Amino acid sequence: MSALLGVALELARVVAVLPRVELARRTQGPKHAVPTLRRLGRRRPRRADDARAALRRTIAAIDARLPGGGNCYRRVLLEVALDAGAAEERVALGVRAGGGVRSGHAWLGEGPSDDGERYDLVIEL
């Protein structure tokens, strides 16, 4: 398969699942949205590391162009819905006590946040 075709297919997969992810993100709390999208993701292929990185780049490219700009929680939910490996990983939601713009972050996997910041509270799902 050509690289261009692979990118086009990945774009199509992300765009196809985006409405379902966005509906869950906007209407359900994480307690319900994450398990719902994990069930979907567990039925998807488990990507190798390089394919998973390509998926993240595709998700980020689409996410950045959506109304309101990029959203880390939406990116996490998209990855969980599209990859069996991501569906098995911990979803972390970090918040700062002071609140305000950019006072929270969502990421996948063990350990500290992927943005290098520290959060007062981290909820793990």
Question: Predicted segment positions?
Answer:
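Alpha-helical membrane-targeting segments
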Residues: M1-G70
